[in-house]
């Protein structure tokens, strides 16, 4: 079984990065070539860190076409048209070309909303983001609680 683990956090994110790095360490310790695990990364910095730990990595580059598709997918009408004409998102095409059987998202991410065919699993660490937003990342003006709700709702339906 070929498992893709989406590693989105960066060393500058502190706790999230180290939590994800601990997941890598656990897989390295307990997976003695039982499963074919590949890490999907968006950062060359993270790719270097994971490769130094002996991990197999593939780099997903966010192109302008991917960004346009991401914007179009937010519209129900445009997303329906993309599905009708069987136009897949570049992220899912990338994963299909890698022949992954399942994707593991180690935290809620917008990338999970792009998957239609490939099954996935997602960690959701806490759900009190609406009532107790004491984490600094939730208080920042750029953080959207609605986007987080949408990601979690999508994951509940599809994963």
Annotated model-derived regions:
Residues 1-159:
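Carbohydrate transferase catalytic cores enriched for Leloir-type hexosyltransferases
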